[in-house]
Amino acid sequence: MKTWDAIIVGGGVIGLSLARRLKSQGLDVLIVEKHEPAREATYAAGGMIASCDPHIPQELSLLVAASAKLYPEFVQELQDESGEAVDLRDAGTVAYFGSGEVSECAGARQLTDDVLSHIEPSLQLRGNAWFLPELCVDPRVLGRSLVQAAKHRGVDMVTGSPVIEVLAAGGGATGVRTTQSEYAAGLVVNCAGAWAGQIAPPSIPTRPVKGQMVCVVPHGGAPHSGPLIQHVVRTPEVYIIPRSDGRILLGATVEEAGFDKTVDPDTIRKLHQAGVDAVPAMAKMRIHDAWAGLRPGTPDNLPILGETSLRGYYAVTGHYRDGILLAPITAQLMAELITGCKPALDLQPFSPLRFG
């Protein structure tokens, strides 16, 4: 039986990014994915690189800033390796804060009503609006590009094969058992997102947090002039994400609903109405589709990054709503840790061992 240097459990944006990074450092890498790569939380995500969000936990601030800085180069590499154009937009975000809230993000500025009307004439909301110098990306294209880039670098993949157990001998990980087979490796990395805690031994406390979204499109297809709005818009009720082809995404709920991915029509109507309240011209667009995804939550709402109590078994999960944002820096830091280098940023606050 072939033995790999590393097995990555889970082929989402985190697993793919890490696999690609480890392969570039000379490791022989296998991704084992329960369904198809980049088709769960990655596929369902909005793709905001919300690096200026004032509600980012303090413990994450350095990782968030570093990852956002890496994004343009990260995307350029993926485009070069995959041959697919990734829709990375840099128009920025218009965010509505609570009374008295301010942004301390470099380059952020408060918007007057006149300036807001000039930069987004279709946006009718007024209030404590700020411009934030953030990026956004189409995660579905990003996921496809990551799959192709990983294959380009020589990462092996097994799909349609859920991992049920991490194999161990002599106090260390030796591979994984799936519902269909076994695979051997010198180390195992659990990047299974919301499903990470379902893999035995059950020492990774993740849970699914449901999010529903809806996509609207112009009647008759996308306008030649591009999207109706240029900026991502974040209000207390909804976030509105334009794509370069004219689609607009509206999201997203935060629901403790287990592994249920049912789309609720009333919820979708409320999201759509919140979008129309902000951008009335959106009422002339039609609903294209709606979906639900499962984010990986943790007890303290921080990612789980590091080696578990089983030698050679690493957890890289629990990114909650920030998996797309944190993918580049997570891949860099965990590749450094796994290959015996000192990570450029401190990962101790995210250690799996913090849960006892």
Predicted segments — roles?
Residues 130-179, 183-187, 191:
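Helical element adjacent to the flavin cofactor pocket in flavoenzyme catalytic cores
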Residues 4-31:
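N-terminal Rossmann-like FAD-binding beta1-loop-alpha1 element of flavoenzymes
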Residues 47-119, 125-127, 274-276:
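Dinucleotide-binding Rossmann-like beta1-alpha1 core, especially the glycine-rich loop
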Residues 20-24, 47-49, 84-89, 172, ...:
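Active-site substrate-recognition segment that forms the wall
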Residues 84-95, 107-153, 253-258, 312, ...:
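Helix-loop-beta segment of a Rossmann-like dinucleotide-binding subdomain
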Residues 139, 279-356:
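C-terminal catalytic lobe of FAD-dependent flavoproteins
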Residues 23-45:
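Glycine-rich FAD pyrophosphate-binding loop
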